[in-house]
Amino acid sequence: MEPVAIENRPYPYFATEANLLKGIKESAAEGLFKSFQLLLGKDVRENGVKFEVLLGVYSNVIQYIKFLETSLAVGCINTEFKDLRRMTNGKIQFKINVPTIAHGDGRRPTKQRQYIVLKTANKHHISTEMELAVLDLEILHSSQETALDVTEYIGAVKTITSALQFGVDALERGLVDTVLHVKLRSAPPMFIYKTLNDPTIVERGMKKTVKSDLVAMFKAHLVEHTFFLDKAQYASQSVQYVMTMLSDMAATVCNETVFKGIASYTTPSGEVVDGVLETTDNVMRKLLAMLGQSGNSIVGPASYASYVVRGDNLVTAVSYGRAMVAFDQFVSRLVDNPNATPSSVEDDLNAISSAAGLGQQNRMAIPSSVIRVGDKTIAVESLQNMYTEAQVPFPLNRRLQYSYYFPVGLHMPKPKYSTSNVIRGAENPLYQPVEAWVVNKNNTLLRFDYTCALRSLCHPKVHNPNPCAGALQAAFPEAPERMEAHGLEYEQPPHMNAHRLMFDYYNGKNVAHVTHIARKTSMSTDDLLHPSAHELLKLEVHPLFDFYAVGAPGARGVAYRATHRGMVGNIPQSLAPAGFQECRGDQFETAACLSHVVDAATIEVVQQSAFDPNYPVICYLIEAMVHGQEEKFVMNAQLIALVIESYWTNTGRLAFVNSFHMIKFICQHLGGAAVSKEVYGLYRRIYGEIVALEQALVKVAGHDDINRRHVGEYTNSLLDPSLLPPFVYNNVFGAFFNRVDRHAEVHVGNYAVDSYNDMAGILNVTDRMEDLVGRFVNLYNNRVDDDHEHRFQLDVGVFRDAENILVLEKIFYYVFLPVCTNGHVCGMGVDFNNLALALAYNGPVYAPAVNGADPILDHLENGTLRDLLQASDVAPTVDMIRTLATSFLTCPVNTQHARVKTRRDPGQAVATHERAKLVGQTLLVNGFAAFAISERNRPACETMFFPVPFHKFYSDPMVAATLQPMIADYVNQIPSQRDVLAFNVPPTIMAEYEEWHKSPMAQYARSCAPTPLSLSTMVCMHNKLSPVAFVNQAKNRIHPGFALTVVRTDEVLSENILYSSRASTSVFVGLPSVTRKEVRSDAVTFEIHHELATLNTSLGYSSILVPAHVASITTDMGVHCQDLFAMYPGEQFADREMHNYLKKKVGAAQGQHNGPDARHLLNAGFACHGPPGLSHGQLATCEVILTPVTADVSYFQSSNSPRGRASCVVSCEPYNAESAENFIYNHSLSDPAYEFRATVNPWASQLGSLGDVMYNASYKQMMAPGLYSPCRQFFNKEDLLKNNRGLYGLVNEYITRLGGAPATSGTDLQFVVINGTDVFLEQPCLFLQEAFPTLSASHRALIDEYMSYKQTHAPVHFNQHLIEEVAPVKRLFKQGNKLVY
């Protein structure tokens, strides 16, 4: 074949490839082409075996030149092993001598200890395919008679050569890839290895303390030194830091190998290359740019050493670092003549090296970047391009996942302080944060507030107590030592005599019970979270429910039940303190633009009146005679005006401030000159304040409606018609049944009705006096003849006001009066017959000869009425008392009580038992709110009045004690009963667990300051703990009563550095073999197999892996919150209208179905679609964990478990599940990370808590596919224990290899990466059970300060806080031209 013919061919395709043919001929010594001529016959497939042999020869000629030219080979001893396929197991044994120290103090010398260590070879099989066309093979062996034949011949050679070159190149890359993976398999992460290899740590053994130290050091090194190149970029001494890290890498690995003193690779000047850094192109450029390079080439062997086989055992032909040339020489010197004259090592080396003149291997210069790190010379290389060309992921690029967390809505405890001297305008200590400002990966400032979390907070799963009760039942099946015994259920009274009920209950009572609600309310946050309070804390598992244990039939005798807390104010003050509630009150004022009508001075006047021990008792008589009837007020207006004016003139205080109706009537009828302008203005301001609060409530509630019901009924209890005022004088039941559609019931004694039409038998409506003139005789007969104790009828007047007056009345009795009196009020019953006797049966009243204009005291004899008038310092006329006595004609006989029950709000309707679906209240019919009675007036009052503690706001035991000596004896005998929180009330009157108002609200009323803000606070405390209320409060930026722990998992693409010490791995390269895989009519497919073997020749871990640089953050690090409506589409509220309203308001995914049919999840009936586009990368899903607002902010400033309690149990026994579970869940033990408390979040850390049942897959929730939960890894009990066992085993395995107990021939332990190491590296939060704090602030001003004053920024500013990012990824924050790193 002449060159001219090639040049003149008409196809330019051949011209560019001519040199390739020449190169192939030279490299194969033209033997390949001659060998193909042996393929004779028409069908080349008949001679397949011959071709395989020839192909093997060809492949063997040009194989693996490139691997020896890589710097990766520095870490290897590369040996050709032609009979590798015959090896079944390859092992090397060598000895380890344990050094000893000679002592001169008389101690006995330590004997020499020697271990035989066994190294095992691992075989690797790499293979590739190539396909040769049958037509090309035929053309290759045909004769070339014409120019066209020559052209076809050249084309066939090119095609076959290209296929061969592809296969050879694949094998070359396969060898490099195999060796790199072998190195990675022996390269633990630096944060693990450096810690475990520290003799200062491991020499103490593996006790609990050492394990906990190790975990702490893992975390410290992980945070401080991961991605060290990024940290060095902005460090002041970046070069020194990088050099320190590289030096630590080189010093940490084991540099001792079996081949002592071997130096296969050196610099051109002869310096030994100590190791190699394998990394990515980007990291390599950064390193060389920062450190510079000391050389650009190294000198290494140009060919492989040789190994031989004897039987089934691998026998090394490398001794003391030099290659044995022939097996015969080995046998003659070491095997066949073992008894020859002993020779020195030098003689052996000389003899080995002298054979065949091959004492020195051929060596060549290899291009490579070389750096100098301390006293070590290290080669630096990137093999990334090889993987990029092959479109295969580079093993040194990894995806790491880090979990972050930050709080939303925390409340800073008193005293409020600031560590900033630059922030201005955010000093208001009442400014309660309802948001968190975070920075995403593109430095965009984002706000996470409660609006973002509504798709989780409003889901039915959050409002369902049954999973928590079931989990508690499973976790604590045995009855606790102390079960709740008081206030659980209301009992029907057998009669209507309230005085007798009080007497029967308190007479001889010497035992008192304190409910769990009261105990939690009276405790401080630290006391409740202390391990000593674990029995109480165990049932504090849900922010929306009060759980308690009751006796149940069965061997274990316990059942767990829950009742809804109903309102934000009912959350115990230890978890929602008074200061926090006042911050919410301030938010309510801001949202409603509320301008108070009353001021602190007005409230102080009311409080002084309530605390006045000489409060006029005549006021109670007048109030009883009027009992809410406007006509009677008008009749007695002169007397009322006289009492008001006299009391104001004498003391500067207000009369009748305990009665809403009296204040309303005063404002309506006593204007002008009836009373002084100043005192009348006070009454007007009080009434105006109530109206202003009602208008603010309506304004904040908005104008939406749900199923033709105003949304205010779902947001605030004061607007809910199911809640009635506590004192009833008129027939409010008609309006009640008309407005309420939630199965309302009215219980009078042992009678119950559920509709207004059925109330005729239990309701006696009394009309005006002028309309009852002809029935006075009947009224008198009924009063005298009836058995009123068993007359189950309520005596009420006609209700003539607008329905909204009930809202005003509720605001007065549930907000204004408790706040202004600090709860020092008690319900009071009246015996109207005795009151009439004291009032009317006096001479001047009936004697017509007495002038009606005369002062009655001039004619009144000594008696009850005279004493009361003198004590009240009031001098009415005779006509005034006569008119007052006339009011008795239509008065009821005595004070009664009724029980009203309704089903709860649809958002609160799910319950553990049937009675918990109802909420009740006791109404005091024709009763009054009484202040303390003075000792002087007590004898007279005892004959007419008696205490009726029927409501948490109206059950002050100290006030009741002034009305009833028996109660006074009771509270003196049991001091704990002097507190309204613990005061026991007859179960026939009320039961706290079933009430609207509970101990926490009474506690706030007791302790609040007499200011207008306290009024707003009490109004806001009536906001419901319901999903509709959450939506409303989020819209108005009002705190819902609980904080959030937001958890997010972000993914990072990391570029890693692998450091390997020299000659630490022996690589055996066998011969390739070719097999025919597939034969078709047009082509033959061959598979080239190649066997390799590797053996770790180091005496320890010779390689180490370090994440050096963040290539990219793939997730957006944003505020996209989990949509539980999409995650759990099968769970819905029973009220369909409310459910659809919520989904619309929160922006939940609108599924393709509305029913809770789980089959939709299985047949693709439900699909969760993301946004149509992305701006910052993949959305990182945030999940929220409900958290008490009292959670310690410092907890979130360092890496911790989002559960609120440490979960990393590496210091426990690995397979002792009981010990591990106690560590995680037993709150009678302190949190191992914070000894002074058991948890920071009882709603998530305990078994059966809300967070536990929401994110713990152990409870087998039916979840939609394709949704990721970042919280699950911190809550799933089985995974917790499994990962902790994995971490325990990982530490133990590494310690076994590094801690002074070397592997022996009996243990066969190898220095490889332990199972779980990759998970630890890529998901450290999973093993450590901790999330990292991310940069967040409760106020944007703190972020601005952080960007402007990096060194002096404020982590705390009154009620605001800043949390710095403490994580392995050190981000550069940028806003405008301001940079913070």
UniProtKB/Swiss-Prot annotation:
The keyword Nuclease is assigned to this record: no
Q: Which Pfam families match?
A: Herpes_MCP
The protein's location, in the record's own words, is: Virion; Host nucleus
Q: In its keyword annotation, does this UniProt entry include Repeat?
A: no
Q: Which domain of life is it from?
A: Viruses
Which GO-annotated molecular functions does the record name?
Answer: structural molecule activity
Which keywords does UniProt give here? Capsid protein, Host nucleus, T=16 icosahedral capsid protein, Virion
Per the record, its GO cellular-component terms are: host cell nucleus; T=16 icosahedral viral capsid
Which SUPFAM superfamilies does the entry mention? Answer: Major capsid protein VP5 (SSF103417)
The UniProt entry, under InterPro entries, shows: Herpes_MCP, Herpes_MCP_upper_sf
Q: Main localisation, per the record?
A: virion
- Known HAMAP family for this protein? HSV_MCP (MF_04016)
Query: What family is this?
Result: Belongs to the herpesviridae major capsid protein family.
The record's subunit annotation is: Homomultimer. Makes the hexons and eleven out of twelve pentons. Interacts with triplex proteins 1/TRX1 and 2/TRX2; adjacent capsomers are linked together in groups of three by triplexes, heterotrimeric complexes composed of one molecule of TRX1 and two molecules of TRX2. Interacts with scaffold protein; this interaction allows efficient MCP transport to the host nucleus. Interacts with capsid vertex component 2/CVC2. Interacts with the small capsomere-interacting protein/SCP.
Q: What does this protein do?
A: Self-assembles to form an icosahedral capsid with a T=16 symmetry, about 200 nm in diameter, and consisting of 150 hexons and 12 pentons (total of 162 capsomers). Hexons form the edges and faces of the capsid and are each composed of six MCP molecules. In contrast, one penton is found at each of the 12 vertices. Eleven of the pentons are MCP pentamers, while the last vertex is occupied by the portal complex.
This protein is called Major capsid protein
